[in-house]
Amino acid sequence: MKVSLPAFEKARVLVVGDVMLDRYWVGPTGRISPEAPVPVVKINQVEDRPGGAANVALNIATLGGQVQLAGLVGQDDTAHALTLGVQTLGVEPQWLTIADKPTITKLRVLSRNQQLIRLDFEEAFDKADSVRLLKQSEALLDSVDVVVLSDYAKGAIDQPRDFIALARAKGVMVLVDPKGSDFGRYQGASLITPNMSEFEAVVGTVTSEADLLEKARGLLKQHHFDAILVTRSEKGMTLVTTNAPELHIPTVAREVYDVTGAGDTVISALATSLAAGADLPQACAIANTAAGVVVGKLGTSTVSRIELIEALALHHGESGFGVVSEDQLAYALEQAKLRGERVVMTNGCFDILHAGHVSYLKQAKALGDRLIVAVNDDASVKRLKGDGRPVNQVDRRMAVLAGLASVDWVVPFSEDTPQRIITRLLPNLLVKGGDYKLEDIAGGAEVIAAGGQVQVLGFEDGISTTAIIQNIMANQ
């Protein structure tokens, strides 16, 4: 399957569920306690990370999506720490504070990358608290495209069927990370994502692939789900829908250090991808890749867009580079600059790619870390070059350019000049081939005003698209 990332910044997601704080005490251990046969850990690091539904929201925000988070918290310092943790990445918390209950906290003691013990601080919330939370969340449905219900069976999501029905009536997809043996609580959901243990807790032991598919289809029919994605650890994922053949996606995890939060990563990547316009098989492939990244980290963690791009390049032959939309490129360029990479940009028709082009693009790439090539679409080439041009359609021209080792991104534009797209992207260095004066280069003034540079490179003499066309015509 060819996998490419959608424009995650367009995703608008609401996460409702059991929020918690994952607290880590970390330090070395070198002796056994004289009081009991247990290791003594000398704590030298304390770290708080949002967990549960809050980790789902952070994953969405890290990918670039817009996310609101609704959950139950206590009136305590832990709630304050949780609020700070999610706001750091731009998540909008919509808490319902329950004064007589603590904010759920999971304290883990780690040494040498191994978890020694976990201590839970929590009390079950009342059913009335869940009713109030879901009612409060209804007001947020008009501002989102996808809702995630992140259920850890702590009381935030007790009976969500009416909430699901209302969301679906408004055209909002509802994804559920389920818990417990009664999937009927989530009736009408767009998609549920049980792991294999959760799935078998509802349908019984799965004896074969055919048995899994039969039982999954039974759940679809019984509870009016549109789809079920069963996550299966080392066996990957299986997607079963009401209107298409099943889809098996093999795991891409190379090393597994910690499965904490892997389910959160799956549903967050699904939600962000679907809200950004990806179809369901694409979203599942992206989620599977994201899960493969996060299990290679220790503790509750998120996956960045850049990590996802690199993993897709490794496992799918798709890097998030190559031919991209303008929106995708704007995001990728922002991330490249954050990594300290120097981005070079050039433009042209590149109708018949020749040795002069290849040499020029190689020179341009040598001036930085990344090279963008903006390509005139077919209509603009015809306006600039006349009838009979372009010889090659824009998708073919871009595909050839994307195949060059020197080129990182190829993006089309429809205007006669690249002024608008250059002004939007503002590379570190804008280059142009030929005998241009710097002041005549489209977008040059804007790049310089933003702190960038403009440079003119020479073309190889005697090589041009026009000359090639004339030579072909003369030899017919």
Swiss-Prot record:
Gene Ontology cellular component annotations, sorted alphabetically: cytosol
Positions annotated to bind ATP: N195, M196, S197, E198
Region (Ribokinase): 1-319
CDD domains named among the record's database cross-references: RfaE_like
GO BP terms, alphabetized: ADP-L-glycero-beta-D-manno-heptose biosynthetic process
Keywords assigned: ATP-binding, Carbohydrate metabolism, Kinase, Multifunctional enzyme, Nucleotide-binding, Nucleotidyltransferase, Transferase
InterPro entries: Bifunc_HldE, Carboh/pur_kinase_PfkB_CS, Cyt_trans-like, PfkB_dom, RfaE_dom_I, RfaE_dom_II, Ribokinase-like, Rossmann-like_a/b/a_fold
Region (Cytidylyltransferase): 345-476
Disulfide bond entries: none
Catalytic residues identified in the record: D264
Pathway in which this enzyme or protein is active: Nucleotide-sugar biosynthesis; ADP-L-glycero-beta-D-manno-heptose biosynthesis; ADP-L-glycero-beta-D-manno-heptose from D-glycero-beta-D-manno-heptose 7-phosphate: step 1/4; Nucleotide-sugar biosynthesis; ADP-L-glycero-beta-D-manno-heptose biosynthesis; ADP-L-glycero-beta-D-manno-heptose from D-glycero-beta-D-manno-heptose 7-phosphate: step 3/4
SUPFAM superfamilies registered for this protein in UniProt: Nucleotidylyl transferase, Ribokinase-like
E.C. number: 2.7.1.167, 2.7.7.70
Catalytic activity: D-glycero-beta-D-manno-heptose 7-phosphate + ATP = D-glycero-beta-D-manno-heptose 1,7-bisphosphate + ADP + H(+); D-glycero-beta-D-manno-heptose 1-phosphate + ATP + H(+) = ADP-D-glycero-beta-D-manno-heptose + diphosphate
Gene Ontology terms for molecular function: ATP binding; heptose 7-phosphate kinase activity; heptose-1-phosphate adenylyltransferase activity; phosphotransferase activity, alcohol group as acceptor
Family the entry assigns: In the N-terminal section; belongs to the carbohydrate kinase PfkB family. In the C-terminal section; belongs to the cytidylyltransferase family.
Subunit-level organization: Homodimer.
Function according to Swiss-Prot or TrEMBL: Catalyzes the ADP transfer from ATP to D-glycero-beta-D-manno-heptose 1-phosphate, yielding ADP-D-glycero-beta-D-manno-heptose.
Name listed for the protein in its UniProt record: Bifunctional protein HldE
